[in-house]
């Protein structure tokens, strides 16, 4: 992950001020967003489609614009650069502060590029986030679509997957019938909108199936479902031990299936401010032992009490 894109002392001061500004609940100016996106693309374009990551680190799932809960996550998991982070995508949409959320994520990436990995989720795509809230939020907060276009350009540079210590395969969604070897991911051109089918699509859209083996048609309309037998074959063929992914709301914030070899991590508590779920982050130590930490939503004024319920199917 080493890069020649080192920050000057002046740039460090500027980005630190931006991080402080965001944590105080203020949005960046259009010019600040433009400069941030340019610098972020310079850093991200040096990263391969598969990031090789060292432990210890903390793995986090979907955030979905829940900015206050992201701040809570860092309070619980530790601030950068003291803690290394791997985020599995879906930073925007659904929540009301996707602008602040992705601005902070990019600012942290620029400031501590070797301490945080940002993978792409299925919502880091124009076709999706123009429908599910990010576009409208950008327009509402800036009065035009310029900032949205700048952010969506960055989405194309986000890596597609990571492997922790050559043993834990990480992607937003999961596996693909088009992938026998993880090396196939290296050949993809990721700087594009997410295709409607194929390996790149499946990495960001697929879901594990608990009760059936083999491949199945996904109810999402993109990606596939895959069974325990597929997980076992994939891990054996690629000399891996586990799969860590996000993409699905799970009420406890974490779910382990396929003989605990496929782990779903979801890091947006009380998803959409109404689902009543817990969130979770997973710390992985040098011996690859996993320690999960579940947490509730950050306190908010005037927020109604929410009962725990499984919602209608979400993209």
Swiss-Prot record:
Active site residues of this protein: 123 (proton donor)
GO cellular component, one term: cytosol
EC identifiers of the protein: 3.1.3.16
Binding site for Mn(2+) 1: 62, 64, 90
Reaction equations catalysed: O-phospho-L-seryl-[protein] + H2O = L-seryl-[protein] + phosphate; O-phospho-L-threonyl-[protein] + H2O = L-threonyl-[protein] + phosphate
Manner of cofactor binding, per the entry note: Binds 2 manganese ions per subunit.
Changes after translation: Reversibly methyl esterified on Leu-315 by leucine carboxyl methyltransferase 1 (PPM1) and protein phosphatase methylesterase 1 (PPE1). Carboxyl methylation influences the affinity of the catalytic subunit for the different regulatory subunits, thereby modulating the PP2A holoenzyme's substrate specificity, enzyme activity and cellular localization.
Coiled-coil residue windows: none
Biased composition (Basic and acidic residues): 298-315
Binding site for Mn(2+) 2: 90, 122, 172, 247
Keywords, ordered alphabetically: Hydrolase, Manganese, Metal-binding, Methylation, Protein phosphatase
Positions bearing Leucine methyl ester: 315
Region (Disordered): 294-315
Record-linked PANTHER family: SERINE/THREONINE-PROTEIN PHOSPHATASE PP2A-RELATED
Protein name (record): Serine/threonine-protein phosphatase PP2A catalytic subunit 1
